[in-house]
Amino acid sequence: MKARLLILLCALSATDADTICIGYHANNSTDTVDTVLEKNVTVTHSVNLLEDSHNGKLCRLKGIAPLQLGKCNIAGWILGNPECESLLSNRSWSYIAETPNSENGTCYPGDFADYEELREQLSSVSSFERFEIFPKERSWPKHNITRGVTAACSHAKKSSFYKNLLWLTEANGSYPNLSKSYVNNKEKEVLVLWGVHHPSNIEDQRTLYRKENAYVSVVSSNYNRRFTPEIAERPKVRGQAGRMNYYWTLLEPGDKIIFEANGNLIAPWYAFALSRGLGSGIITSNASMDECDTKCQTPQGAINSSLPFQNIHPVTIGECPKYVRSTKLRMVTGLRNIPSIQSRGLFGAIAGFIEGGWTGMVDGWYGYHHQNEQGSGYAADQKSTQNAINGITNKVNSVIEKMNTQFTAVGKEFNKLEKRMENLNKKVDDGFLDIWTYNAELLVLLENERTLDFHDSNVKNLYEKVKNQLRNNAKEIGNGCFEFYHKCDNECMESVKNGTYDYPKYSEESKLNREKIDGVKLESMGVYQILAIYSTVASSLVLLVSLGAISFWMCSNGSLQCRICI
């Protein structure tokens, strides 16, 4: 009995066998990503796909300065409000920047027809040629071209008028019928602007135009309207009881526009040959101009980013990331980051790919840790790591390329009478925005899930590669590790790692050691059987003695009577 117990203890106290483990990289990263099934998964490496920062400034777009309207709006600039005269020298721009509450628009009160459509047209214009469509000094010899000024459009405390229009009035007591035409020979679209004056009383009508009933006719291939003055008492705006309505049209190359009137015409003086650009636009912003350059401008500030998404502003100009409402879009490129608990020892549960990664393996994503008489160490599997890096890099680049459709997204303009249309447009835009956001988030969630599964598969494949080489020359110990049945020096370990392990070379030694271990197991089973029988017999004897003692005591004090009958 003692001999058998001694054999068991000797077997249990044998030296540790050589061991090799398959595992993966871990580090001190705190990056977290979301997947379809999990939230806030800590990973070793990830890339951010969402830009959330800007510089708060208006910048040059690809080296071209914007047109800053300052205190003027689009109407004041294009009509030539005297307070906006300095803007007329600008011939080209990357985009137009307008402040939210610009004060200089139409100086003489009135309506600007189709103003929102004009803004939309100008949002795609990157330069124009300003030219005299009807030269001031020789186009209107029978009409007065100097009296048409007003205190409403004053400049430097003097009455003035729009710099692109002429207010024609009577000359020498008459206002002859006029007819003036222009043929577009600019080989570009030409923007033509004019106006119609509506006096507040008949006396002003007679004084200015020498007739009570007047008309203005404007005709081109695509435009045909006849206007009559509406003479009526109105509340004063900017000191004026009268009104001017402003109109515009685009004249195609080769087309002809004809103006006929016998009064009340605010005639074109300058027109604009338009050049359109793909990257232009109009933004409304309080941001100030700075000495900076960018590829993407928003009302909040410039974005310098190659990321596919941004959550700064839906209105963008230039090559910009797609706007989404997300607050986080991070794509995993590494592995689950589960550093091993070092206090649990090098081998055991922490060494495998099941419960934790290795912070000590820094030169690859997947690899090995071995222990033998010559020592221990980590080694990355460079081939599987590089294949994984290439695959994930290509995937990330593909996702960014597919989603990184950079473009200009300008706001749409609606007048006060189009409120229902504006509300409907907002709902449609919100719907598209929700779809874009959902698609972006779902794409990232799915790709993160696939990447983490991809890493798990790679570790498993590496494990199976080692298992298929070792076969029964080693045993699995259930944590990503194998315990050799033979001595495996560093050369042997290296052969396992590079896939050249010589199974027959170690088969005989492994077989002998395996049989010894199996013998010890059988011997141990015999010892355990003897101990079990001994324990059962001893327990039964103790129970019988105890019952006998109790019976004897009860008989002696009369508590138990025993009768023996023959």
Swiss-Prot record:
Disulfide bonds join C21-C481, C59-C292, C72-C84, C107-C153, C296-C320, C488-C492. The record marks R344, G345 as: Cleavage. This is Hemagglutinin. Major glycoprotein, comprises over 80% of the envelope proteins present in virus particle. The extent of infection into host organism is determined by HA. Influenza viruses bud from the apical surface of polarized epithelial cells (e.g. bronchial epithelial cells) into lumen of lungs and are therefore usually pneumotropic. The reason is that HA is cleaved by tryptase clara which is restricted to lungs. However, HAs of H5 and H7 pantropic avian viruses subtypes can be cleaved by furin and subtilisin-type enzymes, allowing the virus to grow in other organs than lungs. It is a single-pass type I membrane protein. It comes from Influenza A virus (strain A/USA:Albany/12/1951 H1N1). One of its GO terms (biological process) is fusion of virus membrane with host plasma membrane. A lipid is attached at C555, C562, C565 (S-palmitoyl cysteine). Its main location: virion. SUPFAM superfamilies: Influenza hemagglutinin (stalk), Viral protein domain. The lineage of its organism: Viruses, Riboviria, Orthornavirae, Negarnaviricota, Polyploviricotina. GO terms for cellular component: host cell plasma membrane; membrane; viral envelope; virion membrane.
